[in-house]
Amino acid sequence: MALVVGLGNPGTEYMGTRHNVGFELIDRLSEKLTITLKQGNGLFVFGEGQFKSTKVALMKPLTFMNRSGSAVSRAMNKYGFGISECIVCHDDIHLDTGKLRLRPGGSAAGHNGITDIIDYLGTRDFARLRIGIGNNFSRGKQSDYVLSPFTNQEREIINEALDNATDAILTFIRGGIHLAMNKYN
Protein backbone atom coordinates (compact mmCIF):
# COMPACT_ATOMS: atom_id res chain seq x y z
CA MET A 1 0.00 0.00 0.00
CA ALA A 2 1.07 3.59 -0.61
CA LEU A 3 -0.46 6.91 0.37
CA VAL A 4 0.72 9.83 -1.76
CA VAL A 5 -0.09 13.23 -0.27
CA GLY A 6 0.29 16.44 -2.26
CA LEU A 7 0.32 19.69 -0.32
CA GLY A 8 -1.25 22.93 -1.48
CA ASN A 9 -4.05 25.38 -0.85
CA PRO A 10 -7.65 24.74 -1.94
CA GLY A 11 -9.47 27.20 -4.16
CA THR A 12 -9.19 28.43 -7.72
CA GLU A 13 -7.23 31.51 -6.65
CA TYR A 14 -4.29 29.24 -5.73
CA MET A 15 -4.28 27.08 -8.86
CA GLY A 16 -0.97 27.31 -10.70
CA THR A 17 0.87 28.95 -7.80
CA ARG A 18 4.26 27.81 -6.60
CA HIS A 19 2.84 26.60 -3.28
CA ASN A 20 0.47 24.22 -5.10
CA VAL A 21 2.94 22.01 -6.97
CA GLY A 22 2.01 19.16 -4.61
CA PHE A 23 -1.63 19.43 -5.70
CA GLU A 24 -0.53 19.52 -9.34
CA LEU A 25 1.45 16.31 -8.86
CA ILE A 26 -1.57 14.55 -7.34
CA ASP A 27 -3.69 15.68 -10.31
CA ARG A 28 -1.12 14.20 -12.72
CA LEU A 29 -0.95 10.94 -10.78
CA SER A 30 -4.75 10.80 -10.66
CA GLU A 31 -4.88 11.05 -14.44
CA LYS A 32 -2.01 8.61 -15.07
CA LEU A 33 -3.37 5.97 -12.66
CA THR A 34 -7.03 6.71 -13.50
CA ILE A 35 -7.84 7.33 -9.85
CA THR A 36 -10.83 9.57 -9.21
CA LEU A 37 -10.50 11.95 -6.27
CA LYS A 38 -13.58 12.36 -4.08
CA GLN A 39 -14.48 14.30 -0.96
CA GLY A 40 -13.15 12.61 2.18
CA ASN A 41 -15.05 13.91 5.24
CA GLY A 42 -14.36 17.60 4.64
CA LEU A 43 -10.66 17.67 5.45
CA PHE A 44 -9.33 16.22 2.19
CA VAL A 45 -10.03 14.80 -1.24
CA PHE A 46 -9.01 11.18 -1.65
CA GLY A 47 -8.96 8.44 -4.25
CA GLU A 48 -7.88 4.79 -4.33
CA GLY A 49 -6.67 2.56 -7.11
CA GLN A 50 -3.91 0.18 -8.14
CA PHE A 51 -0.45 0.50 -9.65
CA LYS A 52 0.75 -2.89 -10.81
CA SER A 53 -0.31 -5.02 -7.81
CA THR A 54 0.00 -2.28 -5.19
CA LYS A 55 -2.94 -0.44 -3.63
CA VAL A 56 -2.41 3.30 -4.08
CA ALA A 57 -4.23 6.21 -2.47
CA LEU A 58 -3.89 9.83 -3.53
CA MET A 59 -4.78 12.68 -1.21
CA LYS A 60 -4.97 16.48 -1.19
CA PRO A 61 -5.66 18.18 2.16
CA LEU A 62 -8.34 20.89 2.03
CA THR A 63 -7.16 22.49 5.28
CA PHE A 64 -4.76 24.96 3.65
CA MET A 65 -1.03 24.37 3.54
CA ASN A 66 -0.05 25.32 7.08
CA ARG A 67 -2.75 23.12 8.65
CA SER A 68 -2.17 19.96 6.63
CA GLY A 69 -1.39 17.75 9.63
CA SER A 70 -4.96 17.10 10.77
CA ALA A 71 -6.03 15.99 7.28
CA VAL A 72 -3.00 13.72 6.76
CA SER A 73 -3.39 12.16 10.21
CA ARG A 74 -7.13 11.60 9.72
CA ALA A 75 -6.65 9.98 6.29
CA MET A 76 -3.88 7.69 7.55
CA ASN A 77 -6.00 6.55 10.49
CA LYS A 78 -9.24 6.21 8.53
CA TYR A 79 -7.71 4.17 5.69
CA GLY A 80 -5.09 2.25 7.69
CA PHE A 81 -1.83 3.57 6.23
CA GLY A 82 1.39 3.31 8.22
CA ILE A 83 4.13 5.94 8.28
CA SER A 84 6.40 3.85 6.01
CA GLU A 85 3.65 3.72 3.36
CA CYS A 86 3.22 7.49 3.16
CA ILE A 87 5.06 10.06 1.01
CA VAL A 88 4.34 13.79 1.20
CA CYS A 89 5.00 15.92 -1.90
CA HIS A 90 5.51 19.66 -1.50
CA ASP A 91 7.17 22.83 -2.76
CA ASP A 92 10.61 23.83 -1.51
CA ILE A 93 12.17 27.30 -1.75
CA HIS A 94 15.58 25.86 -0.83
CA LEU A 95 15.83 24.03 -4.16
CA ASP A 96 16.23 25.56 -7.60
CA THR A 97 13.09 25.62 -9.72
CA GLY A 98 12.40 22.11 -11.02
CA LYS A 99 14.95 20.31 -8.84
CA LEU A 100 13.60 17.20 -7.08
CA ARG A 101 14.81 15.81 -3.78
CA LEU A 102 13.52 12.64 -2.14
CA ARG A 103 14.17 11.95 1.54
CA PRO A 104 13.10 9.21 3.98
CA GLY A 105 12.38 11.81 6.68
CA GLY A 106 14.04 14.70 8.47
CA SER A 107 13.26 18.19 9.63
CA ALA A 108 10.61 20.49 8.19
CA ALA A 109 13.33 22.86 6.91
CA GLY A 110 11.05 25.83 7.57
CA HIS A 111 8.06 24.44 5.67
CA ASN A 112 4.99 25.12 7.82
CA GLY A 113 2.87 22.42 6.19
CA ILE A 114 5.51 19.80 6.98
CA THR A 115 5.87 21.17 10.53
CA ASP A 116 2.13 20.69 11.07
CA ILE A 117 2.25 17.12 9.72
CA ILE A 118 5.19 16.30 12.02
CA ASP A 119 3.25 17.72 14.97
CA TYR A 120 0.12 15.67 14.20
CA LEU A 121 1.92 12.42 13.38
CA GLY A 122 4.40 12.75 16.23
CA THR A 123 7.31 11.77 13.98
CA ARG A 124 9.61 13.18 11.31
CA ASP A 125 10.11 9.72 9.80
CA PHE A 126 7.87 9.93 6.73
CA ALA A 127 9.08 10.11 3.14
CA ARG A 128 9.04 13.40 1.27
CA LEU A 129 9.35 14.49 -2.32
CA ARG A 130 10.49 18.10 -2.36
CA ILE A 131 9.89 20.02 -5.58
CA GLY A 132 12.08 23.08 -6.04
CA ILE A 133 10.33 26.38 -6.72
CA GLY A 134 13.39 28.64 -6.34
CA ASN A 135 13.69 31.62 -4.04
CA ASN A 136 13.74 34.71 -6.23
CA PHE A 137 12.10 37.04 -3.71
CA SER A 138 13.08 40.02 -1.58
CA ARG A 139 13.43 39.83 2.17
CA GLY A 140 9.98 39.61 3.77
CA LYS A 141 8.25 38.68 0.48
CA GLN A 142 8.31 34.88 0.80
CA SER A 143 4.53 34.58 1.22
CA ASP A 144 3.86 36.71 -1.87
CA TYR A 145 6.37 34.61 -3.82
CA VAL A 146 5.01 31.17 -2.95
CA LEU A 147 1.42 32.31 -3.57
CA SER A 148 2.24 33.73 -7.01
CA PRO A 149 2.09 31.86 -10.33
CA PHE A 150 5.17 30.62 -12.14
CA THR A 151 6.56 32.70 -14.98
CA ASN A 152 6.19 31.15 -18.45
CA GLN A 153 9.84 30.06 -18.37
CA GLU A 154 9.47 28.56 -14.88
CA ARG A 155 6.24 26.81 -15.94
CA GLU A 156 8.14 24.91 -18.66
CA ILE A 157 10.71 23.78 -16.08
CA ILE A 158 8.03 22.83 -13.54
CA ASN A 159 6.04 20.83 -16.11
CA GLU A 160 9.14 18.74 -16.84
CA ALA A 161 9.83 18.42 -13.10
CA LEU A 162 6.27 17.21 -12.51
CA ASP A 163 6.74 14.57 -15.22
CA ASN A 164 9.89 13.40 -13.42
CA ALA A 165 8.14 13.62 -10.04
CA THR A 166 5.34 11.40 -11.36
CA ASP A 167 7.93 8.79 -12.37
CA ALA A 168 9.68 9.16 -8.99
CA ILE A 169 6.42 8.49 -7.15
CA LEU A 170 5.72 5.42 -9.27
CA THR A 171 9.22 4.19 -8.39
CA PHE A 172 8.48 4.83 -4.69
CA ILE A 173 5.27 2.80 -5.00
CA ARG A 174 7.12 -0.06 -6.73
CA GLY A 175 10.23 -0.22 -4.59
CA GLY A 176 10.24 2.24 -1.69
CA ILE A 177 11.96 5.50 -0.88
CA HIS A 178 15.56 4.29 -1.21
CA LEU A 179 15.04 3.00 -4.74
CA ALA A 180 13.38 6.28 -5.69
CA MET A 181 16.20 8.28 -4.07
CA ASN A 182 18.86 6.29 -5.93
CA LYS A 183 17.15 6.93 -9.24
CA TYR A 184 15.93 10.55 -8.89
CA ASN A 185 18.21 12.41 -6.43
Functional labels for PLM-detected ranges:
Residues 110-113:
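Hydrophobic alpha-helical segments within soluble ligand-binding/sensing domains
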Residues 2-105, 115-129, 136-141, 148, ...:
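Nucleotide and nucleotide-moiety/phosphate-recognizing core
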